[in-house]
Amino acid sequence: MVIDTSALLAVLLQEPDAPRVAQAIEAGSPRLLSAANLLEASIVIESRKGEAGGRELDLLMYRSGIEVVAVDQDQAETARVAWRRFGKGRHPAALNYGDCFAYALARSRRMPLLFRGNDFSQTDIDCVPVP
């Protein structure tokens, strides 16, 4: 499965559904994260919790066995197409920059995507249900 930034942040920020999101992360195999989403998650968590937040992210990644996948040219093109089809200001899904890379990795690996919210459910990507 591919993990979107929103799922990691739900766990790190201890949002109400954090236990269920953490359970979904642990249930998935393999667990992949786009390098673009790692940076996005780092920026958000460190802006809220400082460098300690970054360390919490690193620990979550390590303990969960999440593999970071580099963005290649095919994923970049898939992300461009995703933005054209589902991007903010173009479609109700309103995918942002990071969302487009999560979408691209899921599409390129033919894997479902774990996320929070309702943005990706308005696209054509397969979704991981949160219990």
Task: Describe every region a protein language model picked out.
Residues 28-31, 64-67, 111:
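Short active-site oxyanion
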Residues 25, 62, 107:
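Anion (oxyanion) recognition and catalysis
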Residues 67-112:
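Active-site neighborhoods of divalent-metal-dependent phosphate/nucleic-acid chemistry enzymes
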Residues 35-36, 73, 117-118:
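Short secondary-structure boundary segments
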Residues 1-33, 46-59, 131:
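Short, well-structured N-terminal submotif of metal-dependent ribonuclease cores
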Residues 8-9, 38, 120:
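A generic structural signal for short hydrophobic patches within well-formed alpha-helices
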Residues 103-131:
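Acidic, PIN/NYN-like endoribonuclease modules and their adjacent C-terminal/linker elements
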